[in-house]
Amino acid sequence: MTKKVYIKTFGCQMNEYDSDKMVDVLNAAEGLEKTDTPEDADIILFNTCSVREKAQEKVFSDLGRVRELKEAKPGLLIGVGGCVASQEGASIVSRAPYVDLVFGPQTLHRLPQMIDQRRASGRAQVDISFPEIEKFDHLPPARVEGPSAFVSIMEGCSKYCSYCVVPYTRGDEVSRPLDDVLTEVAGLADQGVREVTLLGQNVNAYRGALTAGSTEIADFATLIEYVADIPGIERIRYTTSHPKEFTQRLIDTYAKVPKLVSHLHLPVQHGSDRILMAMKRGYTVLEYKSVIRKLRAIRPDLSLSTDMIVGFPGETEEDFDKMMALVHEMSYDTSFSFIYSPRPGTPAANLHDDTPREVKLKRLQHLQATIEENVARISRSMVGKVERILVEGPSRKDPNELSGRTENNRVVNFPAPLASHPRLIGQMIDVKINHAYPHSLRGELLLVSDDASAATH
């Protein structure tokens, strides 16, 4: 009987990518297949996030729930990976003695060896070291399902923002060699991938050697240009970028590379220079707006999303008003916004914070309501327009329909004959948008290409 692994992923796209790699590693070493049901699993892994306190506590809550599964199935192995594992280390085993494996983002490739050692010794295995970027040398070729895929191009962060634990849990920035990244992307294209999302904690800080051991360095703009030349790749996205690393060369890439989508996630975190300085972000609001102005001069239709933190220690009503002014000026399409959560070991955790919780919550609700208004307005403006989408698969709401994404990352559901589904999935097609809903769009297929036309017959 095939053994199975269940993985629950918390947090960012980097963690989603790492979870996929865990499956690849365990499949190559032990023949394990992924399951969506923890009760069916022989190994249960939690790939964790420590950016916010609630996410961290939820891990231990979930661990408590799978404890019963282990009691009923003694051979079951339970592991904790990701940033909480890096931060807490062996204390996870002290708090939850039934945990067998604790590993960091940089040591997931060692899972098979850790499992062997756990079975041989009967003792929990902990490995949260930072072995540079070694893991990419030990990962099997990616296995993908669907036309979109993530590709990690670098690890870690060297910015050390005052509120953030990532540099402590993932280490400093280390970039993969250019040829290593291109080999992975080409392999994905051979499997039918049409859209890649390049990943990094500060993805535009990429500085990769041309080849392993080479002294010649490729910047992020160069990497994008090379990825665009790979046959089969039709769309390029990336996340998460940092305003401080947004070079003129990268801005110019938007004019030179049509495959680079007109959608950018560029976290600003706040709209007050005083708060940005306290956060140690390394730029001013004016410098941030200058980047967006230059980009929109090249791509007037650029869709912009961001991250924002409300209630950072010392935030005044005036500071918050400046944040809201920036929101209105930038016309953000989406924002991942949260109330500040102090993380142990970060400089900001020691800052005096006298803003009442109810005030922070009121500010967050106002921010999110404004962003939602922006989202609805932008969605309504798309009605009647023709949008190019990548068909990803059957619609979640109605399997008789298909679903895809626009350049600005909107989900579009549209009817199509069932017989055409296999050929349309993975294709770039044109749809006319007919309706805008709170979290999706609805459209109709337009036969504008030979591929799409052939797919409907």
From Swiss-Prot:
CDD domains: Radical_SAM. Residues 143-377 form the Radical SAM core domain. It is an enzyme of class 2 (transferase). Its EC number is 2.8.4.3. It catalyses: N(6)-dimethylallyladenosine(37) in tRNA + (sulfur carrier)-SH + AH2 + 2 S-adenosyl-L-methionine = 2-methylsulfanyl-N(6)-dimethylallyladenosine(37) in tRNA + (sulfur carrier)-H + 5'-deoxyadenosine + L-methionine + A + S-adenosyl-L-homocysteine + 2 H(+). It holds the Pfam family Radical_SAM. [4Fe-4S] cluster 2 binds at C157, C161, C164. The keyword Metal-binding applies. GO terms for molecular function: 4 iron, 4 sulfur cluster binding; metal ion binding; N6-isopentenyladenosine methylthiotransferase activity. Binds 2 [4Fe-4S] clusters. One cluster is coordinated with 3 cysteines and an exchangeable S-adenosyl-L-methionine. Keywords: 4Fe-4S, Cytoplasm, Iron, Iron-sulfur, Metal-binding, S-adenosyl-L-methionine, Transferase, tRNA processing. Residues 380-447 form the TRAM domain. It is found in: Cytoplasm. Its cofactor is [4Fe-4S] cluster. [4Fe-4S] cluster 1 binds at C12, C49, C83. Disulfide bonds: none annotated. Belongs to the methylthiotransferase family. MiaB subfamily. PANTHER family: CDK5 REGULATORY SUBUNIT-ASSOCIATED PROTEIN 1 (PTHR43020), MITOCHONDRIAL TRNA METHYLTHIOTRANSFERASE CDK5RAP1 (PTHR43020:SF2). NCBIfam families: miaB-methiolase, MiaB/RimO family radical SAM methylthiotransferase. This is tRNA-2-methylthio-N(6)-dimethylallyladenosine synthase. The lineage of its organism: Bacteria, Pseudomonadati, Pseudomonadota, Betaproteobacteria, Burkholderiales.
